[in-house]
Amino acid sequence: MSSDTGPATTATPALAVEELVAGYGGVIALDRVSISAGTAAITAVLGANGAGKTTLLRAVSGMIRPRRGRVLLDGTDLAGRNPEQMVRAGIAHVPEGQAVIPELTVEENLRIGMMSWPRGRSRADRSAALDEAFERFAPLAARRRKLAAALSGGERQMLVIARALLAQPRVLLLDEPSLGLAPRVMAQVMDLVVRLSREHGITIILVEQNARGALAIADHGVVLNLGRVVAAADAATLAADVALRHHYLGF
């Protein structure tokens, strides 16, 4: 395993996590974790169950408060802010589990994504943003007034990503977006992730159990084990490291 164990870095990282320590009660789930993600790049965060991947996203998004360390967005330290403040700063989080509100329609679910907008934004701005969301996620347009409970797993995943994008983030945190999806739908979701990065300039932190698929689309990768970074490099280097793959990634 020859991969560099320092953080995957770029010349101008949009998001940098420095020496982050976080946990639950007396359990330390992240131990001095440092990573960075370049503007409009995809950074895959990989590792076995319990490695600390989801905790990392929760700490970055404000769902849990780090015990130590910094979360820098364009150089500004946001560590310790709550989720609403993180969204307003430009970080949106899509947790695993396709967490739609089933009793609301597709459009009503999407409107929740605009709750962080300043009060001065006009109704026309909101309508235009919704139209853009339905154009970008065409399968949702035909179900605009259907209850979210009626959507398939793939459509629900599209909905939660579309809702997060309506907050107009610079950084998008995706936790297991392919979980439970059929291979064809999973490929569509991965293609969407690439387009968000390449065409819309969004910096993406992608947590995935499907390490092979994540490295295939990522620019950089970080491997966690027991709350620590054990490898970080460009995605091609990690994918080519046979010992690393077998030991930590399962392929």
Language model regions located:
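ABC-type ATPase nucleotide-binding domains, specifically the catalytic core motifs of the NBD
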Residues: 25, 43, 81, 106-128, ...
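The feature captures the beta-strand-to-loop junction immediately N-terminal to the Walker
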Residues: 46-48
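Helix-to-loop junction immediately C-terminal to a conserved catalytic motif
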Residues: 61
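Conserved ABC transporter NBD signature motif
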Residues: 69-77, 89, 126-130, 233
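Conserved ABC ATPase signature
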Residues: 147-151
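ABC ATPase C-loop
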Residues: 164-165
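Helical segment within the ABC ATPase nucleotide-binding domain
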Residues: 187-201
